[in-house]
Amino acid sequence: MTARALWLLCLIVGWSPEAPVAERKAPPPHRKPDSRETPGPRAQPLPEFSRRPRAAYAGPRAWPDPRRRKTAPPADNRAGFRDAVHAPAALPGPRLAQAENRASPPEDSPRRALSRAVRPPGARAASPAHPNRPRAAAQPSGTPQALSPEDREPETQSCARACSADADEWEAYCASEFAVNGIVHDVDVLGAGMRLVTLLVDPDGLYKMSRLYITPDGFFFRVHILALDSSSCHKPCPEFKPGSRYIVMGHIYHKRRQLPSALLQVLRGRLRPGDGLIRGSSSYVKRFNRKREWQVRGATHTQCI
């Protein structure tokens, strides 16, 4: 009974408002570790900027008047303005000690001074020939000099006049043994002034055949013609361009027609009896056009004298 009463008494005293409340130890506030506790670089304190009083921001900001803004003076192109803008270069400083190790100036170099010496016009130092460069062969004194353009012009005009002479189709038709119209298929150069021409002729292009030897080749006929040029012109006469169409009138080669023995050795059986033969400007070789074809066809219906 005594223990129970003592326990109730203690309980009443503990819940009484007059009883002093036990002071509880509050935890220490959270703080950053000190520099002594954490190693490392120390944080620099931020500078404190002076703040303006709030009265300065009370009113609205006044924008400057553009009309009162001063305009920049126009740039002057005079020499005085450029001299004022560009400051003169500063005077060179004292020469350093390391400059003594530099190369000597160009005036002190004897090699450059020798190269700058005045040379007479046209004089050139003879340099040794390059070992891999072929030397130009010296022209003998007896060889003729090349013709100048003024001397070569009359010869060129005479060659062009002889090749482009307009021959009469009726006279050429009567003086020739064959007349064909064909496309140049191949031109074989046998030597100087010798060409073997192969023409592809359609049936309508055989104006005059006589004993001309032709070889069928599909829709066309192959005709071989030996063109001889005895002129000294740089351009062959007559001229045959592969792929072009020509009207050709000339003679027919046969065994009774004599040819130089040197020419026969070059041909070596490539020219057969019955092939065509034309000699320079004496034969008719012209580019095909409708007017010339009409005149040649008109000559086929006339009687030659």
UniProtKB/Swiss-Prot annotation:
Signal peptide limits: 1-22
Biased composition (Basic and acidic residues): 21-39
Disulphide linkage map: 159-233, 163-237, 174-304
InterPro entries on file: Netrin_domain, TIMP-like_OB-fold
Coiled-coil segments on the chain, per record: none
Keyword tRNA-binding attributed: no
Ranges of residues in domain NTR: 159-304
Keyword Disulfide bond listed: yes
Name the UniProt record assigns to this protein: UPF0450 protein C17orf58 homolog
Family affiliation: Belongs to the UPF0450 family.
Originating organism: Mus musculus (Mouse)
Key words of the record: Disulfide bond, Signal
Region (Disordered), start-end ranges: 18-160
